[in-house]
């Protein structure tokens, strides 16, 4: 993230078309990545993971799995966080243009999103991410009014925390899977009652199940806060530089970002094809 001058208010409240397009792509892509959660049982998922890790799948199936991961894995979720940051920066600039207080007004939005996310988690789906975005918004909103150097420092801290957490999870998973065969759903204490207890399982049982294991199901939502914050700050930076919103702004920076994606992003994603 390079230093930039203070944010200037948006000249007009017109729709930002590139922002709308990116937001639509991010939402559609995230839906495409996560739709299997609603269509595949834990038993099928565990069986597929076991076949994948133990080399049971044929070469074509393994290639298709790697190609799908190459195109989808993490990319739309990252885009969604970046677009969220772009939206926050646009709201901040419009608040400046109108002389409105910041971040007081946005904090009310974030608290409302946190409440909606909590309701969604309890009554609908245990993998809710709205609460994560609400917490990130509460952290990022005051940062948008700070100098670019302060935002860059927070970006680096958040990125470092994200990398450390990712490495810790990777090491833990490697040791866990090396200790024996792939775990089955009934081996997970949070899933044990769900998949092994006899008798009907109703909606009220589902609510109780989520509340009893709230820390288990919220661990990922908490763990992705640093990485999401870093991407949100990237989105805000993209708006400030004008690299996406103004075609003629900063062509050199746009070219550097394009090369960065080709030289680092593309090869790192291609590692998914390795056995």
Language-model features: where?
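Solvent-exposed interhelical
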Residues: 103, 139-154, 237-260
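Internal alpha-helical transmembrane segments
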Residues: 90, 94, 100-169
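Specific transmembrane alpha-helix
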Residues: 78-93, 131-144, 223-246
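Long hydrophobic alpha-helical segments that form multi-pass transmembrane helix bundles
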Residues: 157-236
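Hydrophobic alpha-helical transmembrane segments of integral membrane proteins
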Residues: 17-22, 27, 71-74, 78-82, ...
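C-terminal TM-helix exit segments that contain a strictly Trp-centered aromatic cap at the helix terminus
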Residues: 33-37, 164-176, 267-274
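Alpha-helical transmembrane segments and their helix-start/interface "positive-inside/aromatic belt" motifs
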Residues: 13-31, 148-160, 251-260
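N-terminal signal-anchor module of multipass membrane proteins
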Residues: 2-84, 91
